[in-house]
């Protein structure tokens, strides 16, 4: 099943109770990224234009490393920016 929730006006999609969490909205906030990480997903997808700056994109990896206790390798394997 797929569910949707709004955080800071941005839609977060969750598939199969957290097997996959995705957001495709532009200019997402830290709150959106944190809400996604709190779902403890196996895989995460963002659209490239979710981020206003390249630094914002780098920050998602750090957020997931902290919230999920993922290693550098797990972050690279489990997060996709398309």
Name each model feature, range by range:
Residues 1-82:
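Accessory, often C-terminal, charged low-complexity segments
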């Amino acid at each position: 099943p797929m569910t949707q929730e709004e955080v800071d006006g941005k839609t977060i999609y969750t598939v199969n109770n957290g097997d996959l969490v995705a957001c495709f909205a532009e200019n997402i906030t830290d709150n959106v990224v944190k809400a996604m990480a709190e779902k403890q997903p196996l895989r995460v997808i963002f659209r490239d234009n979710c981020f206003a700056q390249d630094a914002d994109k780098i920050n998602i990896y750090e957020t997931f490393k902290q919230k999920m206790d993922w290693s550098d390798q797990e972050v690279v394997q489990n997060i996709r920016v398309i």
